[in-house]
C-alpha cells in the first residue's frame, strides 16, 4: 500500500494484484481503489475475482514486480515472468538482528540474512531452487 502511494507520487501506474483463499478473506481492496490503483483480486475458490492464484491474475503487460507473500507463491510468480522485480521475503527469525542465522536465504551473493540484509531482495539474486 505504501509502495503504491510512492509510485503514484512518482507518476507511475501501479497495479495491485491481491490473492486470497475466499471472498471473505479479501482485505485492502478498497484502500487501493481509493488511491486510484487498479486492483485485481484472485481467490483460490473463485468466489471473487479470478479463480486461482496471483499468478493467474497477473496483467498481460507490466514492467516490474514488487511482491510479498508465502514462499511458494513468490517462487511461482518469479518463475512465470522474466521481468525484473523486488521481493520481500518472509522468514522465521530467531533473534531479529542477524546473529543466529536462522532466517538465511541463498542468493547469488551467498547466504543472506532476511532480518539484516533484507527482507527485500531483487528477484534475480534469489536462488529460488534452494529456497524452502
Task: Indicate residue ranges for each PLM-predicted region.
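Short Fe-S-cluster ligation motifs
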Residues: 28, 34, 106-132
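FNR/FR-type flavoprotein reductase catalytic core
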Residues: 1-89
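Nucleotide-activated chemistry modules centered on ATP-dependent adenylation/adenylyltransferase
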Residues: 58, 74-76, 88, 97-98, ...
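Local cysteine-cluster metal-coordination motifs and their immediate loop/turn environment
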Residues: 1-2, 71-72, 90-119
Amino acid at each position: 500500500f505504501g509502495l503504491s502511494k510512492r509510485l503514484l507520487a512518482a507518476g507511475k501506474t501501479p497495479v495491485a494484484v491481491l490473492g486470497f483463499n475466499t471472498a471473505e478473506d479479501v482485505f485492502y481492496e478498497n484502500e487501493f481503489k481509493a488511491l486510484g490503483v487498479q486492483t485485481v483480486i484472485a481467490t483460490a475458490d473463485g468466489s471473487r475475482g479470478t479463480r486461482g492464484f496471483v499468478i493467474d491474475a497477473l496483467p498481460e503487460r507490466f514492467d516490474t514486480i514488487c511482491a510479498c507473500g508465502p514462499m511458494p507463491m513468490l517462487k511461482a510468480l518469479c518463475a512465470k515472468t522474466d521481468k525484473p522485480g523486488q521481493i520481500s521475503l518472509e522468514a522465521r527469525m530467531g533473534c531479529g538482528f542477524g546473529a543466529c542465522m536462522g532466517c538465511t536465504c541463498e542468493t547469488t551473493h551467498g547466504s543472506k540474512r532476511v532480518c539484516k540484509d533484507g527482507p527485500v531482495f531483487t528477484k534475480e539474486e534469489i536462488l529460488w531452487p534452494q529456497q524452502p
